[in-house]
Amino acid sequence: MDTILLTGLFAAFFTTFAFAPQSIKTIRTRNTEGISVVMYIMFLTGVISWIAYGIMRSDFAVLIANIVTLFLAAPVLVITLINRRKKHV
């Protein structure tokens, strides 16, 4: 493997799995105090756009990294929205 590919894989791994600790904590505790809904909506819009880009370019590294990111970050947004709705009911 060349240096460019290794650098890309290194970056993809850490940016993808950066959401794992927050996702695990939120799923376990259901505590979403301090979570920004706007940030997660904007972020997930970007992730979905990257998935579309990966499909159009047949770039499986981009595609896989962003699919994993989607599955790590989306539960945080969903739980946050559920909790906010419960507060207002």
From Swiss-Prot:
Residues 7-59 form the PQ-loop domain. GO terms for cellular component: plasma membrane. Changing residue 66 to A: Impairs sucrose transporter activity. Changing residue 19 to A: Decreases sucrose transporter activity. The chain crosses the membrane at residues 4-27, 35-55, 60-82. InterPro entries: PQ-loop_rpt, SemiSWEET. It is found in: Cell membrane. It is a multi-pass membrane protein. Pfam families: PQ-loop (PF04193). Keywords: Cell membrane, Membrane, Sugar transport, Transmembrane, Transmembrane helix, Transport. Changing residue 22 to A: Slightly decreases sucrose transporter activity. NCBIfam families: SemiSWEET_2. Homodimer. The homodimer mediates transmembrane sugar transport down a concentration gradient. Transport is probably effected by rocking-type movements, where a cargo-binding cavity opens first on one and then on the other side of the membrane. This is Sugar transporter SemiSWEET.
